[in-house]
């Protein structure tokens, strides 16, 4: 069998379904206005929700961190790679996002994917049962698979269905896992119900706040803080490459949980630590997020969200009822969605097309990601340009 020919047939099948993904090349820093593939565009593709990726304070902190610590960490966190910058950042993250716990501690990871794998594989295993929302992020799904636990998927956001599954389960360890803000729909999980169910059934509750951290709650402290939730059963995962404008992720939980992860989480133990300079940039980001400037950026973003919702409601397509920076516009077929994306691109607007398997078949969509770096003039351009995709996709 020709191995390359097998892959080529698979790629041809991907093309036939309109599912080929392509990388675009950014020539400038992430921002609302940037150069991509040699063209000036207004970007609605990034997750830089507060517009901090090119913030001078973060850039200077990163540069100073590199001057002090060098370009790389030199090892894993347990074998020489854990710097003073990493340790200080973990203390800051625990204080910032750990209000749900009486004894919070944080653990910093190089990526959100690794953090989710760590939480699920270290807290659940053979004999445990994980209850996973049907629309959870791929990293959570992979974490459930790698855990070797029994996995039960409950209908999206359906706390009553989850309750029934928990009542019927006699596993010694139960773990509920959910995104807070769902990345492709922009809706928010019923977090208060999930916390109540976790406590009623003696289950862990792992929440991935990738799209809520920095944006939701007082001072951007996240979705749990937005709802005033507290519980010893909570394990909070936050991402630092979206609203925080840098890179990496973290877990905050009771100090005993974090110590268990240090000892048992393979995706933490067996990998090189992120460069200390990144931790320095994140520390600077936290200061901005919690400041008056952070409040102003969140207020501007909230106004942009409401204006975008009004714009999308005026199209003949199906906007998802999202009050977050993720604003999806469901078109349907892959072909129509790609045509809409191309028409927007021709007018200097980068709005990505999201297709299966990321979303269910027949629900391909434009995913409009908003940033505090956007202006209302940017939204006016988007509103005017949507006429062309409508005609192209009709």
From Swiss-Prot:
Transmembrane segments: none annotated. The keyword Protein biosynthesis does not apply. Substrate binds at residues 21, 137, 358. It catalyses: 6-carboxyhexanoyl-[ACP] + L-alanine + H(+) = (8S)-8-amino-7-oxononanoate + holo-[ACP] + CO2. InterPro entries: Aminotransferase_I/II_large (IPR004839), AON_synthase_class-II (IPR050087), AONS_Archaea/Proteobacteria (IPR004723), AONS_Proteobacteria (IPR022834), PyrdxlP-dep_Trfase (IPR015424), PyrdxlP-dep_Trfase_major (IPR015421), PyrdxlP-dep_Trfase_small (IPR015422). Keywords: Biotin biosynthesis, Pyridoxal phosphate, Transferase. It comes from the Bacteria. GO terms for molecular function: 8-amino-7-oxononanoate synthase activity; pyridoxal phosphate binding. The modification N6-(pyridoxal phosphate)lysine is found at residue 242. Its cofactor is pyridoxal 5'-phosphate. Pathway: Cofactor biosynthesis; biotin biosynthesis. Its EC number is 2.3.1.47. One of its GO terms (biological process) is biotin biosynthetic process. Catalyzes the decarboxylative condensation of pimeloyl-[acyl-carrier protein] and L-alanine to produce 8-amino-7-oxononanoate (AON), [acyl-carrier protein], and carbon dioxide. Homodimer. NCBIfam families: bioF. Belongs to the class-II pyridoxal-phosphate-dependent aminotransferase family. BioF subfamily. This is 8-amino-7-oxononanoate synthase. The gene is bioF.
């Amino acid at each position: 069998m020709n191995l390359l020919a097998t892959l080529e047939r698979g790629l041809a099948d991907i093309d036939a379904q309109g599912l080929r993904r392509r990388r675009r090349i950014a020539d400038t820093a992430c921002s609302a206005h940037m150069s991509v593939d040699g063209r000036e565009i207004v970007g609605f593709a990034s997750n830089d929700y507060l517009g901090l990726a090119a913030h001078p304070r973060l850039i200077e902190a990163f540069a100073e961190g590199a001057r002090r610590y060098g370009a790389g960490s030199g090892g894993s966190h347990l074998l020489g790679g854990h710097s003073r910058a990493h340790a200080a950042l973990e203390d800051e993250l625990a204080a910032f996002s750990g209000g749900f716990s009486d004894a919070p501690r944080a653990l910093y990871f190089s990526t959100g994917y690794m953090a989710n794998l760590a939480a699920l594989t270290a807290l659940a295993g053979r004999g445990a049962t994980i209850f996973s929302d049907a629309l959870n992020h791929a990293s959570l799904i992979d974490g459930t698979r790698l855990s070797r636990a029994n996995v039960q998927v409950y209908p999206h956001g359906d706390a009553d269905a989850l309750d029934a599954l928990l009542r019927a389960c006699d596993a010694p360890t139960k773990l509920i896992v959910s995104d807070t803000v769902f990345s492709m729909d922009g809706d928010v999980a019923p977090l208060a119900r999930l916390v109540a169910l976790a406590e009623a059934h003696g289950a862990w509750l792992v929440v991935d706040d990738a799209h809520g951290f920095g944006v939701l709650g007082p001072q951007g402290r996240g979705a749990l803080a937005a709802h005033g939730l507290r519980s010893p059963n909570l394990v909070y995962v936050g991402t630092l490459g979206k609203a925080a404008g840098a890179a990496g992720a973290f877990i905050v939980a009771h100090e005993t949980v974090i110590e268990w992860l240090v000892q048992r989480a393979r995706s933490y133990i067996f990998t090189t630590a992120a460069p200390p300079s990144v931790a320095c940039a994140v520390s600077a980001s936290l200061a901005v997020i919690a400041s008056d400037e952070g409040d102003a950026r969140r207020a501007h973003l909230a106004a942009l969200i409401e204006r975008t919702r009004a714009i999308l409601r005026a199209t003949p397509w199906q906007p998802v009822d999202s009050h977050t920076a993720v604003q999806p516009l469901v078109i349907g077929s892959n072909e129509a969605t790609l045509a809409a994306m191309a028409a927007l691109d021709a007018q200097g607007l980068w709005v990505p097309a999201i297709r299966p398997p990321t979303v269910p078949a027949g629900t391909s969509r434009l995913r409009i990601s908003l940033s505090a770096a956007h202006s209302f003039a940017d939204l006016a351009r988007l509103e005017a340009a949507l006429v062309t995709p409508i005609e192209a996709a009709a």
